[in-house]
């Protein structure tokens, strides 16, 4: 009897830990993605999506063809110095809003000395929602010229971010509950930056029982005040 109980307990523990992840990128082609707004190039190199900066074009976005509401998103990213980038979440592109310009929440990728990677920006809408002036200790989480691991939890009105396990941003906002995810190649104004790249790989999403797999609040960044 004791063995049966032990077996059941082990089974339950394993079930609780079995988080369902879905890859958003198959490592081979861009099936399930579409390019929006600008003309920067996206290509696949060594199993990663590589965005290539281009002069004379606005911000370019590679967006999922599916929309997502509540989710946990993880990915690895790497960016060349001199660029800026981000990952859109719960974002939209509508003909009647700024001629289809992509807008919505953005996980910031910022290799500059400002070091706001992991902050939350509202692309083409309200600008900064959570700059890292609200959480200065997170400014050292991002590593230049190296692969970094990101985690984003968007559950209900809560959006929280981490880089390399360090909590970065934490907001409550209800403007957009559902939208696509997109990889940004930011516009550049310096010809010397043309051809520089930002890379993403191991992109995966969990949309099942996300509340169950949320990180405890004690391990999140301080809440931002949007008022």
Regions found by a protein language model. Name each.
Residues 1-5:
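Positively charged n-region of N-terminal signal peptides that target proteins for export
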Residues 19-227:
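Carbohydrate-interacting regions of secretory-pathway proteins
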């Amino acid at each position: 009897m004791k063995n049966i109980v032990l077996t059941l307990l082990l089974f339950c523990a394993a079930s609780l830990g079995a988080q369902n992840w879905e890859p958003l990128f198959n490592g081979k082609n861009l099936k399930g993605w579409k390019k929006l707004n600008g003309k920067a190039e996206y290509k696949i190199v060594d199993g990663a999506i590589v965005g290539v900066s281009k002069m004379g074009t606005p911000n370019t976005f590679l967006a999922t063809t599916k929309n997502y509401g509540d989710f946990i998103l993880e990915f690895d990213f790497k960016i060349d110095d001199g660029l800026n980038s981000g990952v859109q979440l719960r974002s939209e592109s509508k003909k009647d809003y700024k001629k289809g310009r992509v807008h919505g929440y953005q996980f910031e990728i910022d290799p500059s000395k400002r070091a706001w990677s992991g902050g939350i920006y509202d692309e083409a809408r309200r600008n900064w929602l959570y700059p890292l002036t609200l959480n200065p200790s997170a400014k050292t989480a991002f590593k230049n010229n190296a692969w970094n691991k990101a985690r984003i939890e968007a559950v209900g009105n809560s959006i929280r971010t981490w880089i390399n396990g360090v909590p970065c941003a934490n907001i409550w906002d209800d403007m957009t509950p559902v939208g696509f995810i997109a990889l940004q190649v930011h516009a550049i104004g310096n010809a010397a930056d043309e051809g520089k790249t930002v890379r993403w790989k191991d992109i995966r999403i969990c949309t099942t029982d996300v509340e169950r797999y949320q990180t405890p609040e004690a391990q999140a960044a301080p809440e931002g005040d949007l008022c």
